[in-house]
């Protein structure tokens, strides 16, 4: 499964971004879609998980759709202090906030980062959109952020609970922000989810297998031929068809 970008972005541009998007917003969503297509779609993950991850990103980044650093960079928290061994500070980074050294190291193990890719030793790598997307998907599926809450608990064959799913990231679903016109955080994200799910479903396209692509390509070939007609006085007319090289 792949997603037609024109269809997807046309949908969310209207429903979520007031008719216009900045390039960083497009780039952030592109990173999320690309990570899904490359790493997760082959595993048969539920598209509702993708839609909820996009909705969470929309909320957590204040619609910027780019990985962000935790406000205050962990000031007053143990994880806001520089680690003596690595020289890194493990405050929150990403589309959703990855915090604490143990979690940065866990991301390295789970996602098989090595060398200069390692988040434990290069914490700002968590701000790269492709890395942030993979951390978000793995963390939300495996309950890294608020155990035991994960995608599968809220989106499965019998359940679709985008309101309750806020528990995956934060227990603030009942809180009503001053700017929200009386709508709770859980219901705000539920609304974003519904719009992202529409865009995801509208843009989903089955990707052809390589042999099917070759077959279609061969059917579309135009074959040029050379026709030679030989006419003799007493014999039959003969026609020789020779395909051009």
Predicted regions and their residues:
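Intrinsically disordered, low-complexity segments used as extracellular stalks/linkers
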Residues: 206-207, 211-215, 219-221
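A short acidic/glycine-rich loop-to-helix N-cap element
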Residues: 175-192
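Peptidoglycan-targeting cell-wall enzymes and recognition modules
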Residues: 2-31, 40, 49-140
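Acidic helix/loop microenvironments that form the catalytic cleft of cell-wall polysaccharide enzymes
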Residues: 57-60, 150-177
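Short, low-complexity, charged amphipathic interaction modules
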Residues: 217-245
């Amino acid at each position: 499964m792949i997603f037609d970008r024109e269809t997807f972005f046309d949908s969310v541009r209207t429903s979520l971004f007031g008719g216009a998007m900045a390039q960083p917003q497009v780039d952030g969503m592109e990173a999320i879609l690309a990570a899904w297509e490359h790493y997760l779609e082959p595993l048969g993950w539920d598209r509702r998980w993708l839609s909820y991850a996009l909705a969470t990103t929309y909320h957590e980044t204040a619609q910027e759709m780019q990985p962000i650093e935790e406000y205050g960079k962990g000031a007053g928290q143990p994880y806001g202090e520089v680690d003596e061994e690595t020289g890194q500070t493990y405050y929150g980074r990403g589309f959703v906030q990855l915090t604490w050294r143990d979690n940065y190291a866990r991301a390295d193990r789970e996602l098989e980062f090595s060398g200069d890719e390692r988040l434990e030793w290069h914490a700002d790598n968590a701000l790269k959109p492709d890395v942030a997307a993979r951390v978000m998907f793995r963390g939300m599926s495996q309950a890294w952020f608020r155990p035991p809450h994960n995608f599968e608990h809220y989106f499965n064959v019998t359940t679709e609970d985008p309101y309750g799913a806020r528990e995956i990231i934060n227990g603030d679903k009942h809180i009503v922000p001053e700017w929200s016109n009386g709508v709770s955080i859980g219901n705000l994200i539920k609304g974003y989810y519904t719009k992202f799910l529409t865009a995801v479903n509208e843009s989903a396209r089955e990707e052809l297998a390589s042999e099917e692509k070759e077959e279609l390509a061969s059917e579309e070939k135009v074959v040029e031929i050379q026709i030679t007609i030989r006419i003799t006085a007493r014999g039959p007319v003969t026609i020789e068809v020779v395909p051009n090289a």
